[in-house]
Design a protein with these regions (language model features):
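Pyridoxal 5′-phosphate
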Residues: 2, 8-316
């Protein structure tokens, strides 16, 4: 994964084939701007801005919670939804549902993993809770996380604390974090022989602090501890792949920085760990080692997850 460049962004916009600025000729002009040494950032980003249908009367400074989808993604979602409503069962299950495999492969390529390690979810919370609630823990087992992790995820661990008698340790660290070694030392010092899980954010949701997750994950691996990384705010935002984190589990919301449809997320689980995690909703025993067991949620709109592919095209 790389940072957005002028050329790749505009090529992606042009490739969508939509009329978001009314004239296709304007796209060709924009492409020439991208390669011109005299073009300035304002011209380029104005063109990118036209790809989005945004209320001009409001300056939206919060794209971290839910980002808008470009018109190309909205159009793809709309067309597929309309088609699914014309012949629902046939279109949804025979035509649209199988396309999730193409999306799975493209996400796996972006993250640098095997497609059999990627599940498509509705958001990062669902993806993380799948593992938080599905991983086998006994009374007395410890989970190490931080006070600055996402509240919903902390609430999930607290529920397991009440329900199963596990122990949740919340590491405090300063904001801003000046020395990454201080963070690593703080987390490692909380680890004991009873620690079974370490759960940390890649980018802190409130501050934007990027944490040294690779160091933590490698230490966890050496000690036989499951490492969970909350990447809700990092995927498609900063350049990295799974190898840069070395985590066992990674989850993100695709409706944030990737600009995929609202209600899309991704879960990565290292292949050999899949059998050890129960899905949130029941799946047959034959799927015990299949990443798709985490997608067994009943009837859902296939058009939504298929439009993730259009978001990837735009992003790249």
């Amino acid at each position: 994964m790389t940072y957005l460049t002028r050329r790749t962004a505009l090529q992606a916009i042009a490739a969508t084939g939509t009329s978001f600025i009314g004239i296709t000729e304007a796209l060709a002009n924009a492409l020439s701007l991208a390669t011109s040494a005299s073009s300035n950032d304002d011209e380029f980003w104005f063109t990118v801005r036209q790809a989005y249908a945004i209320d001009p009367t409001i300056v939206n400074l919060n794209n971290g919670g839910v980002a808008p989808s470009p018109r190309s993604v909205q159009d793809a979602l709309r067309r597929a939804t309309e088609r699914a409503n014309e012949i629902p069962a046939y279109e949804m299950w025979r035509n649209q549902e199988p396309q999730i495999e193409t999306v799975r492969q493209r996400l796996a390529t972006m993250f640098g993993v095997d497609q059999e390690e990627i599940a498509i979810t509705r958001n990062a919370s669902e993806a993380l809770e799948t593992v938080q609630l599905g991983y086998r823990l006994r009374a007395g087992d410890e989970v190490v996380t931080t006070t600055q992790d996402y509240p919903r995820m902390l609430t999930t661990w607290e529920q397991r604390e009440r329900r199963d008698g596990i122990v949740v340790k919340r590491v405090k660290y300063p904001t801003p974090l000046v020395n990454s070694d201080d963070f690593v030392d703080a987390v490692v010092s909380a680890i004991t022989p009873q620690t079974k899980v370490v759960h940390i954010s890649h980018i802190v949701f409130l501050t934007g602090q990027i944490l040294p997750v690779q160091s933590i994950c490698r230490i966890a691996r050496e000690r036989g501890i499951l490492s969970i990384v909350d990447g809700a705010h990092s995927f498609a935002h900063i350049p990295f792949r799974r190898a840069d984190l070395d985590c066992d589990v990674f989850a993100t919301s695709l409706h944030k920085w990737l600009s995929a449809p609202i209600g899309t997320g991704m879960l990565y689980v290292r292949k050999d760990l899949i059998p050890s995690i129960w899905p949130l909703m029941a799946a047959p025993k034959t799927m015990d080692a299949d990443i798709r067991k985490f997608e067994e949620i009943g009837t859902h709109p296939a058009a939504v997850h298929n439009a993730i592919g259009d978001a990837i095209t735009f992003h790249q």
